[in-house]
Amino acid sequence: MEKYNREEFEEVIVDIGRVTKVVKGGRRFRFTALVVVGNRNGLVGFGYGKAKEVPDAMRKAIDDAFKNIIHVKIKGTTIPHDVEVKYNASRMLLRPASEGTGVIAGGSARPIIELAGIKDILTKSLGSNNSANVVRATIKALSLLKS
């Protein structure tokens, strides 16, 4: 496992969820956080954290994200080729785009694409729009790219 300089990376919170457990004395709340980190130069990762308080969940998610960093192959400002990936019920389609197109991505796929440093890309999220699964499908698709 490589050590990364955390100052070089940006963090984006994709999703914060609240989970409720009903007990005899009332409701107990716990929080989950889904975070994406990237250096806008080919390194990107995601992490998932759970805790009783939101800041603790975010910290755990950021720590987890640095353990799951992948290197993305970038060709100019876009990706080298089309890729389609399925993760659980989510399908993700990534296509290279000509220069000047910009990032065409919705929901939780956009921060991953931007933090990876890709400037021009077409993406389509098919099937489930569960943010955790879309993030995992996008990361899986980016990891399958070959230069």
From Swiss-Prot:
Entry superkingdom: Bacteria
A Pfam cross-reference name: Ribosomal_S5_C
Keywords for this protein: Ribonucleoprotein, Ribosomal protein, RNA-binding, rRNA-binding
Domain S5 DRBM: 9-72
GO biological process, one term: translation
The UniProt record lists the keyword Protein biosynthesis: no
Classification via InterPro entries: Ribosomal_Su5_D2-typ_SF (IPR020568), Ribosomal_uS5 (IPR000851), Ribosomal_uS5_bac-type (IPR005712), Ribosomal_uS5_C (IPR005324), Ribosomal_uS5_N (IPR013810), Ribosomal_uS5_N_CS (IPR018192), Ribsml_uS5_D2-typ_fold_subgr (IPR014721)
Molecular-function GO terms, alphabetical: rRNA binding; structural constituent of ribosome
GO CC terms: small ribosomal subunit
Coiled coil: none
Family membership: Belongs to the universal ribosomal protein uS5 family.
Function field: With S4 and S12 plays an important role in translational accuracy. Located at the back of the 30S subunit body where it stabilizes the conformation of the head with respect to the body.
Domain remark from Swiss-Prot or TrEMBL: The N-terminal domain interacts with the head of the 30S subunit; the C-terminal domain interacts with the body and contacts protein S4. The interaction surface between S4 and S5 is involved in control of translational fidelity.
HAMAP family reported for this sequence: Ribosomal_uS5_B
Subunit structure, as described in the record: Part of the 30S ribosomal subunit. Contacts proteins S4 and S8.
Name used for this protein in its record: Small ribosomal subunit protein uS5
Source species taxonomy: Bacteria, Pseudomonadati, Campylobacterota, Epsilonproteobacteria, Campylobacterales
